[in-house]
Swiss-Prot record:
One Pfam match: TK
Catalytic reaction(s) noted: thymidine + ATP = dTMP + ADP + H(+)
Protein name: Thymidine kinase
Function of the protein: Phosphorylates thymidine. ASFV replicates in the cytoplasm of infected cells and contains genes encoding a number of enzymes needed for DNA synthesis, including thymidine kinase. Important for growth in swine macrophages in vitro and is a virus virulence factor in swine.
């Protein structure tokens, strides 16, 4: 079934995976498809994500200026009215403690597309993802190759430093992804 058939009004789609797997690239692809269908899209970015001021992937792919409305917020409850919006796209969904708010938008017949990490650097699922998961109509897992051995599927996010803060935004300067074999080494 094609992706566009899965993105229906009133549905919640969730894309999970480790860092550097292409989740934001997938979201940009969805936005491009929705734009071709003349849907009004709102992209919500967490203020906890201090990595970039633009909507950009780790590989440098960016949303075009004015491609969709971009809202930066600490909580989804602060976003305000989305009455003229067809689709809500949320990157780094695990950053939003009130991610369950997406159910209300789905009840308003909006297309909801979420992307987030499969687990923290401690290999534990983020609670916002756990709470929204039962309400998702479609879930996609995107993997990547281990950054240590380049042989196996990496599903673990590993922090390079000893900082124990749960939310610490960063890229390859702070994190790598690795497979189960390399995690145990």
């Amino acid at each position: 079934m094609s992706l566009i058939r899965k993105l229906k009004p009133g549905t919640i789609s969730l894309v999970l995976g480790p860092m550097f797997a292409g989740k934001t690239t997938f979201l940009i692809h969805c936005i491009n498809m929705l734009e071709r269908l003349e849907k009004k899209v709102v992209f919500i970015k967490s203020t906890k994500n201090t990595r970039d001021k633009t909507i950009q992937t780790h590989s440098g792919i960016q949303l075009r200026p004015n491609q969709c409305k971009i809202i930066e917020s600490a909580q989804l409850s602060d976003v305000g009215s989305l009455t003229d919006t067809h689709a809500v796209v949320i990157d780094e969904a695990h950053f939003f403690d009130d991610l369950i708010r997406c159910r209300t938008w789905a009840d308003e017949k909006k297309i909801i597309i979420l992307a987030g990490l499969n687990a923290s650097f401690e290999q534990k699922m983020f609670q916002p993802i756990v709470r929204i998961f039962p309400y998702c109509n479609w879930v996609k897992y995107i993997g990547r190759t281990c950054m240590k051995c380049n042989r196996h599927n990496a599903c673990f996010n590993v922090r390079k430093n000893a900082d124990k803060t749960l939310i610490l935004a960063g890229g390859s300067e702070l994190y790598i992804t690795c497979c189960n074999n390399c995690l145990k080494k």
